[in-house]
């Protein structure tokens, strides 16, 4: 009888220790998440969230991350949304690249009209266009990551606001 009581006490203590360890880990992860949102630079921030949301994690890991996001306060969620929105805006080249291309074409046309040798101008144009396309491709990748992460934060915020209005 005493052995059973001792075993029960040990099991209860063991479960309590496990719960405390899990709670401490969650608190550390929440602090790391808030730290990432508030202090990481753009590339670090995108890399952090890309790692957390990339395909290939265990299902429980995704659920744990979602519940961790849900534990963030509204102010932190709003700040995260504004940061990712800012990344989206600064990497949106659709506003000025269409204006830049005709100007570049006009420059090349004038250059070809003034000079007989076209190989230098052609290689300059090809190099410039390749550099622009490469920059746009890299920036578009960052923009797409920011948009997808921003959507996650918007969904979490909407859910939190909805849950608060029910209470």
From Swiss-Prot:
Respond yes or no to whether keyword Membrane is given for this record: yes
* Major location (coarse): membrane
Q: Where in the cell is it found?
A: Cell membrane
TM annotation in the entry: 96-115, 119-138
**What keywords tag this UniProt record?**
Cell membrane, Membrane, Transmembrane, Transmembrane helix
Q: Which cellular components does GO assign to this protein?
A: plasma membrane
Membrane topology annotation = Multi-pass membrane protein
Name under which the protein is recorded:
Uncharacterized protein YjcP
Task: Say which species the protein is native to.
Answer: Bacillus subtilis (strain 168)
Write the gene name: yjcP
């Amino acid at each position: 009888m005493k052995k059973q009581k001792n075993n029960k006490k040990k099991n209860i203590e063991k479960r309590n220790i496990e719960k405390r360890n899990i709670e401490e880990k969650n608190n550390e992860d929440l602090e790391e998440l808030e730290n990432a949102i508030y202090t990481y630079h753009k590339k670090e921030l995108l890399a952090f969230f890309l790692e957390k949301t990339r395909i290939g994690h265990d299902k429980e890991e995704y659920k744990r991350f979602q519940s961790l996001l849900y534990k963030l306060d509204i102010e932190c969620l709003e700040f995260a949304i504004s940061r990712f929105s800012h990344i989206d805006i600064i990497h949106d080249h659709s506003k000025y690249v269409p204006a830049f291309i005709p100007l570049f074409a006009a420059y090349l046309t004038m250059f070809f009209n003034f000079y007989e040798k076209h190989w230098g101008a052609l290689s300059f144009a090809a190099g410039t266009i390749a550099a622009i396309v490469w920059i746009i491709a890299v920036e578009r990748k960052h923009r797409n990551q920011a948009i997808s992460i921003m959507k996650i934060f918007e969904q979490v915020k909407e859910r939190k606001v909805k849950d608060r209005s029910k209470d």
